[in-house]
């Protein structure tokens, strides 16, 4: 019997997420580490981390339900709210007192997950002397390559199953037809006329049957059905007219599996179109390119022609194409000159960023001056292997203007960063405003429009999971940090640095959150198919082309390394004259390796090209597999191409020319190379042709005769843990981030160096790591067998500051979320099935916690029988939101009478009876211990130990709900974000503590920092950054105008806000995934994929609102220009912030939101006693003083009255109307 205000049971306070895990080693399987410095080679860094799990005590798994105020998902910041005193083993390495913190053992990183290598036995290159042969008859040369062993997960083999094989229902639809991913007009079916996923059986990753987490066959998973273009499109367009007679498009050979002559047995999804590769062409290249130049900034856009494609990646420094392991891992590689400004005069000169000079030094590799730095594009261009032709050559004979556009698979990472470089030419300080400015989205739109004008329909394919690699590539060098500090110093002094300084200091990756936001924009706004590959996006693009989903391929030259004979890669399209620069793989192989080809076979040459590309890799997708040798690219090529090689194996060749002759480092180089070979050959891709699963190895797509028995058994060391196939579909559709997939398959999380690094950010990340470990634990709990606690012990945290590799301590117990009985709730009735995006968070928070029910244990359920609890999309979506907010502690789970709770809400929030949408229970005078410490090892701040505290008489979500209801829907998530930022102390009025570039563990002395930081201005302007404002030029021809304020502290603040946004977004993604995996929803995988665009917290923060308010607050009322009226002041501000349209309206929005947020914080401070606001977080009368200042500035600029405090907690004297 539950009594009012009490917990359901004594275990509901199990939100203790303090760091209590063991010392953790670097993850064994699969990590890729990108560059973060413009002139940086990959250097093997053997971190001597190996953990030996010692568990003196076996802790039984407990289901900890929520305490009435289970606010502890962030660990230390939240644990101090309603948690018992923690033992002294919270965060950090080597902290005494923890049974989980056993001393780490040490072993070379690259030996993690691998058996001892046996001596090489075969001759020739491609032979790593390994444990298995990674080549197959008829497909690859006889060159076995070692990729390591020791993994116990039999990829490609069928594990033991209960009750035999799955039910075997065909999987409908095609992977190219996810919701909103079609083109704007139907493009017809693919080659063959059959449904794309015909004859597919639900099964596991890489050919293994798909299993539920309890070991039974998972018969619920199916790929999305064909839905056409957009949300409400029909199930598929009628077949197009028969394709013209003759050879397939672009000269693809009949019988090659592409085109009418090939044995294709599947149709193109609505987003597909038949076609083949490109045609032949001139071997010359139209432009001269200078190499060996310094990192000069490109010339102005006025002299550049429009270009589409991935031009000359070789002209970039290795780290400029800075993908991360999350999306290619998640962070797009860079390349210049992808898009021009429209309406500019053409010029024959393409401005491509240049390679670093040989005088540049590379961290960790002082003796590497003779290492190869030439990029693959340069290498091929110098040999006349870049073909040039007109785009018309890529269209089929007889193609008319009314025929459907050709589908082009585009490397999304490469493309997006190329557009970022165009933005850099317009505004070299673009990143100070936002990592996703509107101008970048405008460039994306222009890119799509230009391609469509040329009758090309793009398919953006983003990178997925990566391969393990060199952790030292994460390090940001001291020189780069010093350059950043110098640029910031100039900006703070009012001086604009030159473009070369800015580019050298801030060669930043975009981030997976930006990439996924762009993918959602492509799908929702532009109708472009945008997907995330399971692993290497080039492999998925090849699969698309092989199976007729795409007609053409557009990507970097490194795509030639894939063993696909029918490959012609477009690297650039000049819009001004329709010329196309492309690479023909067959021609390249025959020209480079004439001694290793026959008239009909280039397999051996392809193997040599793969070795050459991996040894000299400059592309970020391969950088973690690059081995640095004391040879130039030409010298490497000469050894690989000669008919009489000096070395019997590639392993011997690498060992002989390694920069370091230490045995351990040379072994690491060999493993890196072999991992790269395996990653290129065995990346998993979605396929329409597999007999048993749509997710197969690339080699099986290229050679359908290969079976599971032909596949290696130790690929876990390259690709990671086995997970349900449905998770890869979720990643494919953009619902589940690659960051989360990396954590659950490859056991690590990564954080990149921010634009403005602060000690506060380091502290914040440490706090958020506890939440992230709990979030990951939620999905591991659903899929892991053995239990998830074993898998979470292996999680590692990779970051840019020392120590670069840290343990990601697991929570003692995982949060056990309740289910919800909502089928008859009023809140559900308010949701429109067709307009779920219009949901109200206030309505979600008004659901009484009495509707929650303890989850039924999986072990108690009969096999294959999962009760359906949520019977529609709106029920499922509401349950996802309820579970997410429950995870954050927004439901008290008390049994207080509804009338008592409602009366309390009306009294505290000043709400009439008709205004309330439901009841939010509150706890009554419970006891809790609030604690906080500081762990020196992991540098995590804990709040001061304050002892026992009384629970507040009013529960904080009541104030949040009331505030949301009083504001527009488009800012509702911002108030939730505000609450979470306050809870972890990111919102405060203290100046940021900037990191000392000479020592990333030390902050710059406050005496050396600018002290123009009025605490009221800091607090108000930071809050204003949570408002999203438009900021873009009204016309392309307008000159760029710098905004009047550059705030280093606002930039540093938004870095922390962005980290919080990512955590919250990952939370709702994981909760969505767990609802699907639990099997208690009637929704299909397609239905879940549609949630990706409407789940909250997907926005990327911007400083524009904060910059605008900061400018208003720090200047006198006349702006030193004798302005006497509000109209004059607004007009003056509009001139300063020209790119903010309708400035008066947006200033009203910013100031109104900031005041409402201050009222909310004031309510938290007064009536929820340190549940949200720490005692020393906002001291004195800072909140009241800031409100006073805001009111005064409101009088100076806005005509109507400011918003009042809807909570009726601010002094009544401030509620009087303001005279005009």
From Swiss-Prot:
Q: Which UniProt keywords apply?
A: Cytoplasm, Translation regulation
Q: Please tell me where this protein is predominantly located.
A: cytoplasm
List the GO biological process terms: regulation of translation
Pfam entry (one) = MKT1_N
Extent of Basic residues compositional bias: 34-70
Protein family: Belongs to the XPG/RAD2 endonuclease family.
- Free-text function comment from the UniProt entry: Involved in post-transcriptional regulation of gene expression.
The protein in question is named Post-transcriptional regulator MKT1L
The species is Trypanosoma brucei brucei (strain 927/4 GUTat10.1)
